């Protein structure tokens, strides 16, 4: 049980001008970007960041519901905070994100100590919602809405690499995925608003930006305008050309892509635009066509392989990463083996893996051919072993190469090393030389000779 001393309780009840907050983020990059914006809103309101959640006047959990283990963590955290609120009634408890959208008012009934439950579409309305809480209301904001253009300065976790949302929501209907029901329909931001945000990051000495979207290749489908060739006027490809020449930004990334919409025109743009990094995250989910059909993914393995071939024909050293699900309902041993074969055939740099987890309000959740937990565990262990082996083999190609590394900071586990990432998004540790003068700043790009490769990181020395 969380307890406070009398001194701590007195300190907690200090003047409201020194209110503090704590945000815990679960899940994807979109959630991380949302949390940065909510932190910016809170600081605009006069809150300061607490040193830990036990000292915060407001605690916010930005949640994920893509798998059930993420939900269990949230409820565990909420249980501890609910006990704390019984001792400190002025404590504000907020749940944001996908779990909040999924559960809505039922979450308020399950955890009555909560003050505010808000879905992802309401991130930019946090200040107004907290105003309602201050009037004594318990608030649930989960109705579908147009996402207002964010005018709040985000509190960025990095001073070098910035997230930039370009499209919200998802119109796909994958049979296993809860995202469309909790993130809403696709809503693209206008190019000029995106460019303005990136320009502000450049003015603040950011060097790298990552464009974000649940289905980023869908960017612009909902915006007006059609070219004389009959395609949409504003696409991800067009946006890359539009933002490429912003001075100060040296690296551009984007995620997450959908194979159904990954075009040759986009690949050509990535090849031509030297700021766009040679790293592509393109989930395949299964290596079997029948399972892909059951998943309602809208492509087959031949199409997926063609995309990878087209990328590597122009950028042979490009990093290819992906997502995969094992033990989908009805998946046979042979269909599972097809997934392992695809990983071996393509040679991914990394694959994020998960055993299938039934999610509320998705078609696959109610199918009768669910696989056992034992099968899920076995297949997940096997695929993870293969992914690690493949990643280790892929990273061997960097040995003795000279790679450009963007410095992000000191290695928190080894103060004699700095750390950063290559253009292909390989985490790289660099030993700080003792026998020569070496001055560096965050955001510098340095040439590093790679001398050690592990499955998910590299180590090297200054050239």
Swiss-Prot record:
Q: Please name the CDD domains in this protein's record.
A: Radical_SAM
Kindly state which keywords UniProt assigns to this record, in alphabetical order.
4Fe-4S, Cytoplasm, Iron, Iron-sulfur, Metal-binding, S-adenosyl-L-methionine, Transferase, tRNA processing
- What top-tier enzyme class does this entry carry? transferase
Q: How the cofactor binds, per note? A: Binds 2 [4Fe-4S] clusters. One cluster is coordinated with 3 cysteines and an exchangeable S-adenosyl-L-methionine.
Query: Which cellular component terms (GO) are annotated to the entry?
Result: cytoplasm
Per its UniProt entry, which superkingdom is the organism in? Bacteria
Positions that bind [4Fe-4S] cluster 2: 170, 174, 177
* Swiss-Prot/TrEMBL cofactor(s): [4Fe-4S] cluster
Which HAMAP family does this UniProt record tie to the protein? tRNA_metthiotr_MiaB
Record note on quaternary structure: Monomer.
Q: Sorted alphabetically, which NCBIfam families does this protein's record hold?
A: miaB-methiolase (TIGR01574), MiaB/RimO family radical SAM methylthiotransferase (TIGR00089)
Q: Which family does it belong to?
A: Belongs to the methylthiotransferase family. MiaB subfamily.
Question: What does this gene product do?
Answer: Catalyzes the methylthiolation of N6-(dimethylallyl)adenosine (i(6)A), leading to the formation of 2-methylthio-N6-(dimethylallyl)adenosine (ms(2)i(6)A) at position 37 in tRNAs that read codons beginning with uridine.
| Protein name, as recorded | tRNA-2-methylthio-N(6)-dimethylallyladenosine synthase
Q: Which organism is it from?
A: Prochlorococcus marinus (strain MIT 9312)
């Amino acid at each position: 049980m969380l307890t406070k001393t009398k001194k701590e309780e007195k300190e907690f009840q200090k003047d409201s001008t020194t209110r503090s907050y704590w945000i815990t983020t679960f899940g994807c990059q979109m959630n991380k970007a949302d949390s940065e914006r909510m932190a910016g809103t809170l600081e605009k309101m006069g809150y300061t960041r607490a040193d830990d959640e036990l000292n915060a006047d407001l605690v916010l959990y930005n949640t994920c519901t893509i798998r059930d283990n993420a939900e269990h963590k949230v409820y565990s955290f909420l249980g501890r905070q609910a006990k704390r609120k019984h001792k400190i009634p002025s404590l504000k408890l907020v749940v944001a994100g996908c779990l909040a959208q999924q559960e809505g008012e039922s979450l308020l009934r399950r955890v009555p100590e909560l003050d505010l439950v808000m879905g992802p579409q309401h991130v930019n309305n946090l200040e107004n919602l907290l105003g309602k809480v201050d009037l004594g209301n318990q608030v649930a904001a989960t109705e579908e809405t147009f996402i207002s253009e964010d005018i709040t300065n985000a509190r960025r976790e990095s001073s070098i690499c910035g997230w930039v949302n370009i499209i919200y929501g998802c119109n796909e209907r994958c049979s296993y995925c809860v995202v469309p029901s909790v993130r809403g329909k696709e809503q693209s931001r206008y190019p000029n608003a995106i460019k303005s945000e990136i320009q502000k990051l450049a003015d603040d000495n950011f060097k790298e930006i990552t464009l974000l979207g649940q289905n980023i290749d869908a960017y612009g489908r909902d915006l007006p305008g059609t070219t004389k060739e009959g395609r949409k006027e504003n696409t991800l490809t067009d946006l890359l050309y539009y933002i490429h020449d912003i001075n100060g930004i040296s690296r551009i990334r984007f995620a997450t892509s959908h194979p159904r919409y990954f075009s040759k025109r986009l690949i050509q743009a990535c090849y031509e635009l030297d700021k766009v990094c040679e790293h592509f995250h393109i989930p395949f989910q299964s290596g079997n066509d029948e399972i892909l059909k059951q998943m309602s993914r809208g492509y087959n393995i031949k199409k997926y392989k063609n995309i990878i071939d087209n990328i590597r024909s122009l950028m042979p050293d490009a990093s290819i990463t992906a997502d995969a699900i094992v033990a989908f309902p009805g998946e046979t041993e042979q269909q599972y083996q097809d997934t392992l074969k695809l990983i071996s055939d393509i040679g991914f740099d990394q694959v994020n893996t998960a055993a299938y987890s039934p999610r509320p309000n998705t078609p696959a959740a109610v199918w009768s051919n669910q696989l056992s937990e034992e099968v899920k565990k076995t297949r997940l262990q096997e695929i993870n072993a293969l992914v690690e082996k493949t990643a280790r083999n892929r990273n061997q190609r960097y040995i003795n190469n000279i790679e450009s590394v963007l410095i992000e900071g000191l290695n928190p586990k080894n103060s004699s090393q700095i750390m950063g990432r290559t253009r292909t998004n390989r985490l790289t540790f660099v030993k700080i030389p003792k026998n020569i003068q070496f001055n560096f700043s965050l955001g510098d790009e340095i040439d590093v000779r790679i001398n050690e490769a592990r499955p998910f990181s590299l180590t090297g020395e200054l050239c």
